[in-house]
Amino acid sequence: MVKKEMIAMILAGGQGTRLKNLTKKIAKPAVPFGAKYRIIDFTLSNCINSGIDTVGVLTQYRPLSLLKHIGSGIPFDLNRLNGGVVLLSPYVKESEGYWYAGTAHAIFENIDFMNEYDPTYALILSGDHIYKMDYSKMLDFHKEKNANVTIATINVSFEEASRFGILNTNENNMVEEFEEKPKIPKSTKASMGVYIFNYQLLKDTFEELKSKGNNFQDFGHNILPYILKKYSKIFAYEFNGYWKDVGTISTFYEANLDLIKNHKNLDLREKNWTIFTKSSSHSPQYITSGGNVVNSLVANGAKIEGHVSNSVIFENVKIGKNTIIEDSVIMSNAIIGENSFIKKTIIMENTVVKEKMVLNSLNNQSLNEEDGIILYDGKEK
């Protein structure tokens, strides 16, 4: 194999239990998003647009949907003779075999794959966040600082901070303290789960911890505190664009609707930063003479005979006559009957909504999943 300056490893095995029925049959990174994409498409597209042509995707929980979606990498321009995209599942070695016990353990178990490319730098990513980021600029920062590790950070509210790894830095952005999900945060500078490691240092750290019999399941709890204490030179790279962890029903809903709010850093039509995906062969969308669409994303294959506003409509959705859809996310192959009213609701894939159905948090308290948002699969509770 030809040596690579930097390869990317995408952690994509998460179950995403807080997304409830959305991840009942598929891994969180494979959840459909934004009318035609999957969540992982954003991280993969960031890699391609940043000039990274060697990507390992680490799967675990219900990987079939991801395997089918990514395949050989053709839709993502990652079908390369030297590099490309490789899907990596847990496997049994000669003397041992485990499910991945955490983020760091998943990377450690795939060191052999990484060694094939002898990279100078390892880019570690999560496959379940929505954002657009040029990793090459982060690498330039890493080199400029002569860092051992660089962590991408975003500023969050104090109320949110206890959900993240929190960094305390000096005036030069050098990390002085790292706390994983602190009860009382000392700052609001949160880790995005995007790391650049000097690869040799990462390997040495794994070997040192293993030789001492230490646990190294997780980057936030184990690897980063160890490197900070022994080697230091960890820097924070401040990211000022749009970023969202879509790990809950409310954040998944919000991120979908953010696509129609003209966020300058979440523009799907940006010419120089394509979001790649596996495309379907559906016919063009069809809006009948009685149909009306206002400020919405509508994918191919959709047929709209009712009124849709401020919503995201996925592929092959059918919306009946006189039906009103407001502030909602309607996922692929859903059929919405005539004379229905749907507001602030996520309709799951392949769901059939009966005629004259009313779905909103005021009328359906038993279906109210989170922050007034309904997640509906056609089954009454």
From Swiss-Prot:
Pfam families: Hexapep_GlmU, NTP_transferase. InterPro entries: ADP-Glc_PPase (IPR011831), ADP_Glu_pyroP_CS (IPR005836), GlgC_bac (IPR023049), GlmU/GlgC-like_hexapep (IPR056818), NTP_transferase_dom (IPR005835), Nucleotide-diphossugar_trans (IPR029044), Trimer_LpxA-like_sf (IPR011004). Its EC number is 2.7.7.27. The keyword Translocase does not apply. Pathway: Glycan biosynthesis; glycogen biosynthesis. It is an enzyme of class 2 (transferase). Alpha-D-glucose 1-phosphate binds at residues 100, 165, 180-181, 191. GO terms for biological process: glycogen biosynthetic process. It catalyses: alpha-D-glucose 1-phosphate + ATP + H(+) = ADP-alpha-D-glucose + diphosphate. Gene3D superfamilies: Hexapeptide repeat proteins, Spore Coat Polysaccharide Biosynthesis Protein SpsA, Chain A. Belongs to the bacterial/plant glucose-1-phosphate adenylyltransferase family. Homotetramer. NCBIfam families: glgC, PRK05293.1. Involved in the biosynthesis of ADP-glucose, a building block required for the elongation reactions to produce glycogen. Catalyzes the reaction between ATP and alpha-D-glucose 1-phosphate (G1P) to produce pyrophosphate and ADP-Glc. This is Glucose-1-phosphate adenylyltransferase. The gene is glgC.
